[in-house]
């Protein structure tokens, strides 16, 4: 249907229809009807931001258990990552809790860390260490374990982990 000489009454393909596009099945702009490659291959690679550390059960000597919980993100790429609209989730008891949506303009430099703290006390405690600190808007971490997920602004999972309190 995308060819210039498309004939809806045709009953066989005589090879005269040329549909220019991408023939690489791994590309975002792949078109299964393409008959001629136009070298427009388009790939999308998610930034390499990982959930690097989860501090889910701080010692009570620090104060309230929830105050000092955090998760640490790390950009393992060699370029800065734009985290605008990214979302961090934690799942406890089968319920997915939205913990943070990153504001527009949030970036994480190559090789840099970022801390997502559960409370204002955590933001204060971890904020002076030379990296960005954000306060999560809901939830805290389960001491017995749960699933954590970092998703891009379109809901694609960038990184996800499961942790538990059992010995390895």
Roles of regions detected by a PLM:
Residues 1-50:
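Primarily marks secretory-pathway-exposed extracellular/lumenal segments that are disulfide-
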Residues 44-168:
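Activation on beta-sandwich/Ig-like modules and their edge loops
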């Amino acid at each position: 249907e995308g060819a210039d000489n498309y004939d809806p009454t045709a009953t066989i393909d005589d090879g005269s229809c040329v549909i220019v596009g991408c023939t690489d099945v791994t590309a975002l702009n792949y078109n299964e009807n393409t008959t001629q490659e136009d070298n427009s291959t388009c790939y999308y690679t998610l930034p390499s931001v990982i959930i690097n550390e989860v501090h889910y059960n701080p010692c009570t000597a620090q104060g309230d258990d929830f105050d000092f919980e955090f998760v640490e993100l790390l950009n393992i790429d060699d370029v800065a990552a734009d985290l605008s609209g990214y979302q961090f989730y934690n799942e406890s008891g089968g319920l997915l809790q939205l913990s943070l949506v990153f504001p527009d303009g949030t970036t994480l430099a190559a090789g840099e860390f970022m801390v997502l703290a559960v409370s204002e006390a955590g933001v204060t405690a971890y904020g002076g260490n030379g990296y960005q600190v954000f306060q999560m808007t809901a939830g805290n971490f389960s001491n017995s374990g749960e699933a954590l997920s970092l998703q891009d602004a379109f809901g694609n999972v960038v990184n996800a982990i499961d942790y538990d309190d059992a010995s390895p």
